[in-house]
């Protein structure tokens, strides 16, 4: 895309990004494969142009616990729940299924502070941030089981408005998935 002029913006939540693409305000957006497929099944007028593969969105999600003596979600816990984040809300719902917990509605970005301040007991988080951020050493990291986690949450997908053949051709001509993954790998080193 070096020969094309375009702007980039951060928009919180895949649903918001998808709505902006669908409305024509944005030409394309990145979201998790899970969120994109969910929104397409819900009738959104979008389509996936590129799938960047497992681990391209983030390496994986984990469960963070305030109490190091716990190994997972237990009855009575207060658990972070971001109703505006499709990935986080679906993961959280799956993890707490069948347990009597209190879902505490908050932005995903507030999870760490809420855990450290004792306002919640557990929350879903990005494992890449755990590896980079040493203030998280005070929290217990629990890896999610196969039944709790789907690789589609960690897979980046580029979406455009449905049937925008002109834009699709431009993107396919100018974006290489392998080159993008090479750059991503270099950035992560």
Task: Give residue spans per PLM region.
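Hydrophobic beta-strand segments of well-ordered beta-sheets in folded domains
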Residues: 27-28, 72-80, 100-102, 119-123, ...
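Bilobed "Venus flytrap"/periplasmic-binding protein-like clamshell domains
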Residues: 1-2, 58-111, 164-169, 182-187
């Amino acid at each position: 895309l070096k020969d094309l002029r375009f702007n980039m913006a951060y928009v919180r939540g895949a649903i918001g990004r998808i709505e902006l693409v669908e409305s024509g305000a944005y030409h394309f957006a990145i979201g998790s494969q899970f969120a994109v497929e969910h929104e397409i099944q819900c009738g959104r007028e979008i389509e996936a142009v590129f799938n960047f593969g497992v681990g391209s969105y983030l390496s994986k999600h984990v469960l963070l616990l305030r109490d190091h003596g716990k190994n997972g979600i237990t009855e009575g816990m207060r658990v972070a729940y971001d109703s505006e984040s499709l990935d986080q809300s679906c993961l959280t719902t799956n993890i707490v299924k069948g347990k009597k917990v209190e879902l505490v509605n908050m932005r995903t970005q507030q999870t760490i502070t809420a855990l450290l301040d004792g306002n919640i007991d557990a929350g879903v988080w990005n494992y890449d941030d755990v590896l980079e951020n040493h203030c998280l050493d005070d929290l217990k990291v629990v890896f999610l089981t196969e039944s709790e986690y789907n690789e589609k949450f960690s897979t980046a997908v580029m979406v455009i408005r449905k049937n925008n053949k002109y834009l699709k051709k431009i993107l396919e001509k100018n974006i290489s998935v392998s080159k993008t993954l090479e750059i991503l790998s270099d950035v992560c080193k």
